[in-house]
Regions:
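Asp-based, Mg2+/Mn2+-dependent phosphohydrolase catalytic module
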Residues: 1-4, 14-18, 30-31, 76, ...
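N-terminal helical cap/lid subdomain that shapes the substrate entry/recognition surface
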Residues: 1-99, 107
């Protein structure tokens, strides 16, 4: 293999929990001046719109949120700022994940991230610890498609500059991502979802291929495949 493309949530960082979503809603509600339950319900109702390219920028997302909960326009800027902070807090990898990514790149492999992600994640990404550890990242909110849309896999392959058959896709399986990778001509391996048992997941499907305990096992797995 010449490249590895990783999923983000549940793979490189922990998948969010309902409790974390409620805490984020509380912090945003305090800025907007509305109830936590109102923002929490917004998150529940708008997953597709927030991830599929309908709201590609942080400003788009903040405006949509404020208007959806009948907040005043003057809080759109502060809400965008709070969303960015919340995004930054979601992008903190464990030291063992950092080491695994460094190990892959030290072997000359190209490394990328392909994530169903909303605009606050894309906005926070450039200054996150993960950004310096990979060669490229593709986020669904900016790309305008959700996994397993073939366009996402073509995009990450183009940005990695590596043919599909020389690229391994690694993910926890949300969004039918592993079958999408196989359909794109990539090899694929599942990792057990990073996070707690109640972590949020979307679009899980059955997977009968190889499964690793965590991304930390990817470097030795690739060595074993040679």
């Amino acid at each position: 293999m010449d490249a590895v493309a990783f999923d983000l949530f549940g793979t490189l960082v922990t998948a969010p929990t309902p409790q974390e979503r409620t805490r984020a809603a509380s912090r945003l509600a305090a800025v907007i001046g509305c109830g936590t339950a109102t923002v929490d319900q917004y998150f529940r109702n708008t997953w597709h719109a927030r991830h599929n390219g309908t709201l590609p920028t942080l400003r788009d997302l903040a405006t949509h949120l404020v208007h959806a909960v009948d907040g005043p326009d003057e809080v759109i800027g502060p809400v965008a700022d709070r969303l960015r902070v919340l995004g930054q807090a979601r992008l903190l990898p464990a030291p063992s994940v950092v080491y695994a990514l460094q190990s892959l790149r030290s072997k000359g492999l190209r490394v990328g991230v392909l994530s169903d992600a909303s605009a606050e994640i894309a906005a926070a990404w450039p200054k996150s610890p993960l950004a310096a550890l990979v060669d490229t990242a593709v986020f669904s909110c900016a790309a305008g498609a959700l996994k397993p849309d073939p366009r996402l896999y073509r995009r990450i392959l183009d940005e990695l500059g590596v043919p599909a058959h020389r690229t391994l896709y690694v993910g926890d399986g949300g969004g039918d991502e592993l079958q999408g990778a196989l359909a794109a001509g990539m090899a694929a391996v599942a990792v057990r979802r990073r996070g707690t048992a109640d972590a949020l997941a979307f679009g899980d499907t059955d997977w009968h291929g190889p499964v690793l305990d965590a991304v930390e096992r990817v470097p030795p797995y690739l060595t074993e495949q040679k």
